């Protein structure tokens, strides 16, 4: 890859979510970003696919009347051809453990990109139980954005995607007690 990366950005919380906007702004500092995200909340839809989707222009790119996997397919097929990386998030709520493969729209978008042979990063924000469902602010995603931006800047060149189809990042809320980083396979 020469120059700044081309980034297809999606999520499952919808194109108007604070997490997507925060990631868009952070990633725009290091690359060319095109958002192709659901027009409305599509949380917990897994890898569901639609037979047809409507696509609307949006100030960040495109709003798709469909699932996160639909967004990746539409993006890779027509709206953001040949990106260097697909980023999905920043999700409101962690995506940890094996069960997320079947449920999480955020992780499923990264999996869909991997099926197309495109490196992908799924990014989520851990929320304590009492905050879940209450929404998040733009600023609460700053650590998730920082980690994801770092990975987009550096991971593509390291060869990590020769061994991993996608990365699943889960960041704490700002101000939470730091925990040790764990890399799992």
PLM segments and residue spans:
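Electrostatically charged, flexible surface regions
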Residues: 139-185
């Amino acid at each position: 890859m020469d120059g700044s990366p081309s980034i297809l950005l999606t999520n499952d919380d919808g194109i108007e979510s604070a997490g997507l906007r925060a990631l868009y702004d952070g990633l725009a500092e290091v690359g060319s970003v095109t958002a192709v995200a659901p027009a409305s909340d599509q949380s917990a839809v897994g890898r569901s696919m639609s037979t047809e989707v409507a696509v609307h222009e949006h100030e960040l790119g495109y709003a798709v009347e469909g699932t996160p996997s639909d967004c990746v397919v539409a993006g890779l097929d027509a709206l953001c051809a040949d990106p260097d990386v697909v980023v999905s998030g920043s999700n409101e709520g962690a995506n940890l453990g094996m069960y997320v493969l079947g449920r999480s729209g955020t992780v499923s978008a990264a999996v869909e990109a991997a099926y197309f042979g495109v490196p992908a990063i799924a990014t989520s924000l851990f929320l304590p139980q009492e905050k879940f469902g209450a929404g998040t602010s733009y600023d609460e995603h700053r650590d998730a954005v920082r980690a994801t931006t770092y990975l987009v800047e550096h991971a593509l060149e390291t060869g990590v995607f020769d061994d991993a189809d996608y990365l699943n990042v889960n960041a704490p809320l700002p101000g939470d007690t730091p925990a040790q980083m764990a890399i799992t396979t």
